[in-house]
Amino acid sequence: MTPTYMNIMLAFTISLLGMLTYRSHLVASLLCLEGMMMSLFIMATLIASNTHFPLVNIMPIILLVFAACETAVGLALLISISNTYGLDYVHNLNLLQC
């Protein structure tokens, strides 16, 4: 395994550990989730550049679109929670409440 792949896997692992550690705050969770998505995007781009199969080249773009949608939904949740409660704690997210 090359050092580039090792660094990307290390970035993904650190983001995953940050997600598990700071799961009580929504902002920290969103930042760690974004770090995980960006490391997956870079890994998919490297794999697509190394393989010359034409259908693999669209995979990083699809992953980037999903990351942008995830960011938009996360920021909308953050604004909604901070306007309602004034805090960004995840335990304020009660999906069963109408």
Swiss-Prot record:
Enzymatic class: translocase
GO MF entry, a single one: NADH dehydrogenase (ubiquinone) activity
EC number per UniProt: 7.1.1.2
InterPro entries xrefs: NADH_UbQ_OxRdtase_chain4L/K, NUOK/Mnh_C1-like
Residue intervals passing through the bilayer: 1-21, 27-47, 61-81
Reaction catalysis annotation: a ubiquinone + NADH + 5 H(+)(in) = a ubiquinol + NAD(+) + 4 H(+)(out)
UniProt topology in membrane: Multi-pass membrane protein
Any single GO BP term: ATP synthesis coupled electron transport
Record GO cellular component, one term: mitochondrial inner membrane
Family annotation (Gene3D superfamilies): 1.10.287.3510
Alphabetized UniProt keyword annotations: Electron transport, Membrane, Mitochondrion, Mitochondrion inner membrane, NAD, Respiratory chain, Translocase, Transmembrane, Transmembrane helix, Transport, Ubiquinone
Location of this chain's protein in the cell: Mitochondrion inner membrane
Protein's job: Core subunit of the mitochondrial membrane respiratory chain NADH dehydrogenase (Complex I) which catalyzes electron transfer from NADH through the respiratory chain, using ubiquinone as an electron acceptor. Part of the enzyme membrane arm which is embedded in the lipid bilayer and involved in proton translocation.
Similarity annotation: Belongs to the complex I subunit 4L family.
Subunit structure: Core subunit of respiratory chain NADH dehydrogenase (Complex I) which is composed of 45 different subunits.
Protein name (record): NADH-ubiquinone oxidoreductase chain 4L
Biological source species: Macaca fascicularis (Crab-eating macaque)
Gene designation: MT-ND4L
